[in-house]
Amino acid sequence: MTYSVHFEVNLEAIPEGARHEIRRTVQQIADVVSTIPGSSPFWSSMKESLLQVDVQGWRLVYRVLPDRREIRVIELEALRR
């Protein structure tokens, strides 16, 4: 079962191309996380971890919530150029 993606940030102010790429990237993360076995040591490190990824000039901070099978994007900021 694939992880669902939830954005706790407003993506509307982001240009359409970057917004599309952000959604696509986070969905890819959700798809990959769904393939990790429940017995993997990866999950014990995810309990309190914040992760980040940079996409087209934007930094996203997210959590993996295995009990809910969710990826939650909790922060978004423009990177300085």
Mark where each language-model region is.
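Enriched for short, Lys/Arg-rich terminal
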Residues: 1-5, 16-20, 24, 50-81
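A short, surface-exposed loop/turn module that caps and links secondary-structure elements
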Residues: 28-54
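Short amphipathic alpha-helical/adjacent loop interface patches that line ligand
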Residues: 11, 15, 26, 30
